[in-house]
Amino acid sequence: MNDKKISIIIPVYNGANYLRNAIDSALEQTYDNCEVLVINDGSSDDGATERTAAEYGERIRYFYKENGGVASALNLGIREMDGDYFAWCSHDDMFLPDKCEKQIQALEECGDDQRIVLSEYRLLFVEENLLDEAVKPRKKLKRRMRQDGLAAVLAQMVHGCDALIHKCHFERCGVFDETLRTTQDYDLWFRILRGQKILYLEEPLVISRIHAEQGSRTIPSHIRECNELWIRFVNQVTDREMYKLYGSPYEFYWEMLDFARKTPYRAFEEHVTGKILALEEPADLESRILELKKKFGTGKLFMFGAGRNGRNLNLQLMLRGISIEGFIDNAEEKQNQILDGKKIESLECAMKHPGKKCILVSPDAQEAVIRQLEEAHVTDYLTKAEIEEYLDMAPPLKEKLALLERG
């Protein structure tokens, strides 16, 4: 399949500080049949971006255009590309060396050269100089994504620079909407991935920088555009798609509400809340909640970790009618405080409570916590991944919506 050419398109605006890393990562691909197009979207940095691109000479194809936004730069790249496949590398992101090779190999193995390929990716937090773990979908989401690429979009698992897209999909669905300043990517992913089977590679092939100069942080219209985008998405998803991917419209809207609450998109949150209130609960919800409760046993539940993860998991349990006894945290300054109506204790104090106990491990980095539990001879515990898998057994109860009211 080396005869299939990949066009790596790098749009850039005032990005000389990171551009060299992006171009180098594109040129260093282990897959030989690639071209690199750098689209300068009217940078106003006294020629710094142009000088950086000029260093590469004929190794890249360089285009300059008047400033029109990322969508217009990407569309120029799509018009000018000679390849069979489109790959987008933001000027502040980087491909791992074997990204293109592994994605082409996956296409060869599946036998469908027009299948869209996605992958995991890693986040590089510039201010903290921290390279995070790979962003991975949960088990239930992976099952959905194997059925329909729409699930990946609705779960915000499409980075954009992780994608390898055959050019036929632009002919089928069109290109980026140039009237959108910050949501042009997800607008297109929704159109392109809906109804499509995808390949999802469970390894990170892209490093994505998170920094203060990004458009999503600096363009004033971002929140308004996102509210409009997500309201439009949920209004367009059909009942048939909701049943296929989520089990019911009720479960679909609860998943969308969980996402909305993690964002500043208040209009979207209110819209989805209204959808839930207008629906009846699934007829089998009570029995599913009972089965869920059995997974946590009959003992007292303690949430290990009084941070963001612990609070969120506790909220998800409360939404399903499950109460914890309290929180456990190693930070002495947190101990003996009250969090969400529950006392924070040390592990030693929590284990002195009478009766059976099950510890719910909330931190993402769980190895140290599990080691601590085992050293204390605690064998009844559940990991964050196990808790999340159990929570997927049943959506929240509508009567618990009041728990989500913001102060």
Descriptions of predicted regions:
Residues N40-R51, S90:
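A conserved acidic beta->alpha catalytic loop
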Residues R79, S119, R138-F233, K244-Y253:
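Conserved nucleotide-sugar donor-binding catalytic segment
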Residues D24-N33:
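Short, acidic, metal-binding catalytic loop of nucleotide-sugar glycosyltransferases
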Residues M1-S25:
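N-proximal low-complexity "stem/linker" segments adjacent to membrane-targeting elements
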Residues F86:
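Short aromatic/hydrophobic "clamp" motif used to bind/position activated sugar donors
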Residues A48-T49, K65-M81, K102:
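Glycine-rich, basic loop-to-helix element that forms the pyrophosphate-binding segment
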Residues A260-G407:
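Hydrophobic, well-ordered beta-alpha structural blocks that scaffold small-molecule cofactor pockets
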Residues D98-E133:
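Conserved donor NDP-sugar-binding/catalytic core segment of glycosyltransferases
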